[in-house]
UniProtKB/Swiss-Prot annotation:
Keywords: Aspartyl protease, Cell membrane, Hydrolase, Membrane, Protease, Transmembrane, Transmembrane helix
One Pfam family hit: Peptidase_A8
Cellular component annotations (GO), alphabetically ordered: plasma membrane
Reaction catalysis annotation: Release of signal peptides from bacterial membrane prolipoproteins. Hydrolyzes -Xaa-Yaa-Zaa-|-(S,diacylglyceryl)Cys-, in which Xaa is hydrophobic (preferably Leu), and Yaa (Ala or Ser) and Zaa (Gly or Ala) have small, neutral side chains
TM stretches of this protein: 8-28, 61-81, 91-111, 128-148
Name of the protein described by the UniProt record: Lipoprotein signal peptidase
The EC number(s) this enzyme carries: 3.4.23.36
Compartment list: Cell membrane
The keyword Ion transport is assigned to this record: no
Function field: This protein specifically catalyzes the removal of signal peptides from prolipoproteins.
Length: 168
């Protein structure tokens, strides 16, 4: 049973990678670099963009650093997934999303020497940095990990408060 549960998190990562790579292939195949297609005017655009760095274009061209960091992160995520308990489903989903996102962008860095980005949003007239499915999966995974950690801490604190209370 535990093995089957763990496999679901790897399956989630695989689905993220498939969707990420498919959408990037579509952008590379059918859009010119810099081309922008409005999805919801003034809110959401599909914009063909390339990034040789990290989020928001930081550390441009530092391929070996990204390779090393990604390998360490992926190994760490796999170790955590293997140690998950059946009750840690939300944490497993978070790790699966993070694994898929990390590997999705890693595939780009290995084969394209750059990451294909295309989701371009404007939030209150702010042009948010262009991102992709892998970035979204990583972000959602990290958010879920924080939610899981916060709820676990609240439950632990609640249990310890209950154990320390006195009854007349």
């Amino acid at each position: 049973m535990l093995w089957r549960g763990v496999m679901l998190y790897y399956l989630l990562a695989f689905v993220v990678i498939l969707i990420d790579q498919w959408t990037k292939w579509l952008v590379v195949r059918y859009m010119e670099l810099g081309e922008s297609i409005p999805i919801i005017e003034n809110v959401l655009y599909m914009t063909s963009h390339r990034n040789r760095g990290a989020a928001w274009g930081m550390l441009q061209g530092q391929f070996w650093l990204f390779y090393l960091i990604t390998i360490v992160v992926v190994v760490g995520i796999v170790i955590y997934i293997q140690r998950l308990q059946p009750t840690q489903r939300l944490f497993g989903i978070a790790l699966g999303l993070m694994l898929g996102g990390a590997l999705g962008n890693f595939i780009d860095r290995i084969f394209r020497k750059e990451v294909v980005d295309f989701v371009h949003t404007y939030i209150f007239n702010y042009s948010f940095p262009i991102f992709n499915v892998a970035d979204a999966a990583l972000t959602i995974g990290v958010a879920l990990m924080f939610i899981y950690t916060w709820t676990e801490e609240k439950q632990r604190k609640g249990m310890s408060d209950g154990a320390n209370s006195t009854h007349d």
